[in-house]
């Protein structure tokens, strides 16, 4: 049993890397936030499906908050600046934005795939967890639980370690 859990965790770590690189780094960050290139619909759809597993909540919220971050990097208005919301809330990704100004998300609401995920992320997350657990608790560990933990802590580490100096590095979106 311990070997099965260990293998599930190892597979979950590898799966987390796929989600992190394809879904978060390429799709959310470079494609949506910075509009650096175009991707085919299949690439976008698979990437969004991966992100729903990692519980980033709504992709529109993630993208808009990241755009806010770039406009106000490490200063007032940055939704995940340690100086504004506290080290532990940033580290464990428990910060919250009361209201995101529409200027950061207006273009995103033109994308039906993003809008679908925005409206249904909670139901998708519950379904992913229930179905994967019913398949097997080990499958759930690898497919859903480990990526969830890695996403929460990974984004938190990126935002605490990557912005520990005054001003941080900022590239306009």
Where are the regions that the model predicts?
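Hydrophobic alpha-helical segments that either span membranes
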Residues: 160-161
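Active-site-proximal inter-transmembrane loops
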Residues: 111, 165-173
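Non-catalytic, topology-defining segments of multipass membrane proteins
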Residues: 1-157
């Amino acid at each position: 049993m311990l070997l099965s859990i260990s293998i599930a965790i190892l597979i979950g770590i590898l799966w987390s890397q796929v989600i992190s690189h394809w879904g978060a780094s390429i799709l959310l960050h470079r494609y949506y936030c910075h509009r650096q290139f175009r991707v085919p619909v299949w690439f976008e759809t698979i990437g969004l499906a991966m992100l729903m597993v990692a519980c980033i909540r709504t992709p529109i919220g993630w993208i808009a908050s990241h755009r806010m971050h770039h406009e106000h990097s490490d200063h007032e208005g940055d939704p995940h600046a340690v100086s504004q919301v506290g080290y532990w809330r940033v580290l464990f990704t428990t910060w919250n934005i009361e209201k995101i100004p529409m200027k950061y998300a207006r273009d995103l609401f033109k994308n039906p795939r993003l809008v679908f995920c925005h409206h249904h992320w909670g139901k998708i997350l519950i379904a992913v967890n229930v179905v994967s657990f019913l398949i097997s608790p080990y499958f759930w560990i690898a497919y859903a639980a480990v990526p969830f933990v890695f996403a929460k802590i990974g984004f938190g580490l990126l935002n605490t370690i990557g912005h520990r100096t005054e001003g941080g590095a900022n590239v306009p979106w």
